[in-house]
Amino acid sequence: MNILFAVSECVPFVKSGGLADVAGALPKELKKLGVDVRIILPNYSLIPQKLRDGCTLHKVINVPLGWRNQYCGILKGEQDGITYYLIDNEYYFKRDSLYGHYDDGERFSYFSKAVLECIPHLDFEVDVLHSHDWHTAMVNFLLREKYQDNPLYERIKTVYTIHNLQFQGVFPPEVIYDLLELGDEYFHSEQLEFYGNVNFMKGGIIASDQITAVSPTYKEEIQYEFFGEKLDGLLRKYNDKLSGIVNGIDTSVYNPETDSYIKAQYDAESLYEKSENKRALQRYFGLPEKEDTPIISMVTRLTKQKGLDLVRTVFREIMEEDVQCIILGSGDSEYEQFFEWMAYEYPEKVKVYIGFNEELAHQVYAGSDLFLMPSLFEPCGLGQLIALAYGTIPIVRETGGLNDTVHSYDEETGEGNGFSFTNFNAHDMLHTIHRAIEFYHDKPVWEQLVKQAMTEDYSWEQSALAYKELYKSLME
C-alpha cells in the first residue's frame, strides 16, 4: 500500500501549526503498520540548512502553469525511515514566512500542479494521494479533472483531510483561468465558485474519494451553519464520504518519561517528580514556590478562536482564587496586551511569555496542574492531549476534538480525565475552574484523576489503524 502525503508543512522540516505535527507523526505510525507513506512538500528557504543538506537532487522537470513553464527541482531525502520529496522553486518558496503572501493563490496552484507532474518521476507507484487543508486541496481536484484519463494516474484514489475549515484558500477567479487552465464550466456554484471567487478547499471536498475531519465531533459540527464557514451545505451533500478520525500526539516527542526538556522525568507512579517540575516552573517565572497553589496554564495562539474572550471576561474573578496563571503564546495584539497588563497587575500570580519556546512549552506542560482550553471551536486540538499525557488536567469547552478526548470527571463513579463545560459562556467556564480547583485540594481524588489521565493512550496508533482501513477500502 503506497500513500503519498501532499502537505504544505511538516515536522521536522517546517511548522506553523498543528498540520505540521500531523504530517510528521502519522506517516511514522502508518509505517509501523506496513504502509509505505512518502511526503511531498515545498522546499522553503525556511527549512533548516542541515535538513536541506540531507536531500539530494532527484530530478528536474518543468511544470506548466498557465501560458508558461516553471522550473521544478525534485529533491529527495529520508528522515526517521520516511522518504520526503521537496519541490524546489526559489521564486515561490524563498520567502520569510510560509503563508500570507499576495501571490499565495499562484504559489499553491504551482505546488498542486508540481505534485501531479512529479508523480511519474518519483519511482513510487502511488495508490492513494492524501492531501491536507486548502494548500493542497487542488491536487485532488486537478487529478480528477485533468490527469485521471492518463494511464499513469487513472488508478490513484484520493483522500482529503480538513484540519481547519476556517482557512479555505479563497482567491480571485483569474487563478483558475490564468494558472490552472480551467474553463468557465468550473466557475459556478457546483464547482469552484464561492461568492464570486474561487475556493480551493471546496475543490478538495468535491473531487476527493474520501474526506476526513480531524475528530468525530468536528466532522458533525462542520455540517452545521455555526461551524460550517459557508461550506456546511456542501459538507452535508457529501456526508456519505465524510468521516472523523481524531489526531494523536507523537509520543517520541511528548512523553514525560523520556522528555529531555523538563526538569525531572516522571510517570504515573512517580508523581512526586512532577512536583519538582512545578517548582522549576515557578522558579523560572519568579513565582512564589507554593506546592498547594494550583498552576493554571495556557499554551496557545492568542486568538478569538481559542476562547480568550471568556478568559478576559472573568480573569479578575479567577484571580480571587489562590492560583497562579502562566500564559505562553502569541497572536492578536489585543490579547497579548491584556495578559501583559494582568501580569503587571498581579505580579505574584500571573506570568506571560509572548512568543513560542519549545523547551519552555514542555516545562509548562510538565509543571502545571491545570490546562485551560475554552475554545470557541477546536477541530482536534493537540494541547489538551499533551497536557493529559503529562498529567496536567485540562479544563475545556465541549467542542470538536476537545469533546472527543476530554471526559469530565464524575465524582459518583470516579471516571474521567478532566473538566468540561458546554456553553460558550464565561461564567460556565468560571464555575468549571472553581470545580477543578475544589478537587485539586482533595489530594486522593486528584492523584487518581492524574493517573487516569496519564495512563490513557494518546498516541497515533488507533488513528493510524483507522487511516489504514480507509485507504484499504478505497483500493478494494
Curated annotation (Swiss-Prot):
Question: What pathway does the UniProt record associate with this protein?
Answer: Glycan biosynthesis; glycogen biosynthesis
Q: What is the annotated role of this protein in its UniProt record?
A: Synthesizes alpha-1,4-glucan chains using ADP-glucose.
Lineage top rank: taxon: Bacteria
Molecular function (GO) terms listed? alpha-1,4-glucan glucosyltransferase (ADP-glucose donor) activity; alpha-1,4-glucan glucosyltransferase (UDP-glucose donor) activity
Q: Which GO terms describe its biological process?
A: glycogen biosynthetic process
In short, the EC number is: 2.4.1.21
Residues annotated to bind ADP-alpha-D-glucose: K15
The record's similarity note reads: Belongs to the glycosyltransferase 1 family. Bacterial/plant glycogen synthase subfamily.
Query: Mind telling me what this protein is named?
Result: Glycogen synthase
Q: Which UniProt keywords apply?
A: Glycogen biosynthesis, Glycosyltransferase, Transferase
Quickly give the catalysed reaction: [(1->4)-alpha-D-glucosyl](n) + ADP-alpha-D-glucose = [(1->4)-alpha-D-glucosyl](n+1) + ADP + H(+)
Tell me yes or no: is Glycosyltransferase among this UniProt entry's keywords.
Answer: yes
